[in-house]
Amino acid sequence: MNDAALPPDVSAALANGLQAQSLDADFAAPLLRYLTLLVRWNKTYNLTAVRDPREMVTRHLLDSLAMQPYIVSGTLADLGTGPGLPGIPLAITRPQLQVTLVESNGKKARFMREALRHLALGNARVAEARAEAVDEPAAYDHLTARALDTLAGIIAVGGHLLRPGGSLLAMKGVYPREEIAALPAGWRVGDVHPLQVPGLEGERHLVVVHKD
């Protein structure tokens, strides 16, 4: 399945979304290759509940890339990444970022390995394990989690991976006031950024939590 097998408006939707997010149009080609592979594998392996490639552009690619301005370089562990979201789009658009894709589901891990090979994406690797089982203490500058758990839950399973002074960047819908109030000792909110995702209705926030 090549890019031409996608509905004809998918490429335009992605191009418009990248422009709205002030991202280079050259990123469209590798992102479309990733999307094409995801659509193909999803028919057999049920990697995501989103089936429509047009929806995947908005709800997967552009939503993932909304956090891109806040992660520039360093090391990143993407916890519960599923089929590689947001980790693979971030690795594509931030080549200076070293990304570890943490996922315990074997089908999703196999898909991601194939995607990294297909894209020749040398700045990302797959850790097929639950986050709490990854034995790399204080190895990462950043953690991301897009739809994994509450803030406290993310910290409970993956906080050991973050170096002191590092940041957890968690994608949330409405402002998570109660989750912020329930942060464990040694963790504090640095910023909460309202996000605008092209084509996506509803509130989105990026919560940046620092490890003291």
UniProtKB/Swiss-Prot annotation:
Keyword 4Fe-4S attributed: no
Similarity comment: Belongs to the methyltransferase superfamily. RNA methyltransferase RsmG family.
A molecular function GO annotation: rRNA (guanine-N7-)-methyltransferase activity
Which Pfam families does this entry report, sorted A to Z? GidB
Q: Can you tell which superkingdom this protein's organism belongs to?
A: Bacteria
Q: What is this protein called?
A: Ribosomal RNA small subunit methyltransferase G
Q: Where does S-adenosyl-L-methionine bind?
A: 80, 85, 131-132, 146
Q: Which UniProt keywords apply?
A: Cytoplasm, Methyltransferase, rRNA processing, S-adenosyl-L-methionine, Transferase
Q: Which organism is it from?
A: Xanthomonas campestris pv. campestris (strain B100)
Xref: InterPro entries = rRNA_ssu_MeTfrase_G, SAM-dependent_MTases_sf
Predominant subcellular localization, coarse grouping: cytoplasm
Q: Where in the cell is it found?
A: Cytoplasm
Question: What Gene3D superfamilies does the database record attribute to this sequence?
Answer: Vaccinia Virus protein VP39
Q: What does this protein do?
A: Specifically methylates the N7 position of guanine in position 527 of 16S rRNA.
EC number(s) given by UniProt: 2.1.1.170
Reaction equation(s) it catalyzes? guanosine(527) in 16S rRNA + S-adenosyl-L-methionine = N(7)-methylguanosine(527) in 16S rRNA + S-adenosyl-L-homocysteine
SUPFAM superfamilies found in the cross-reference section: S-adenosyl-L-methionine-dependent methyltransferases
Give the UniProt entry's GO cellular component terms.
cytosol
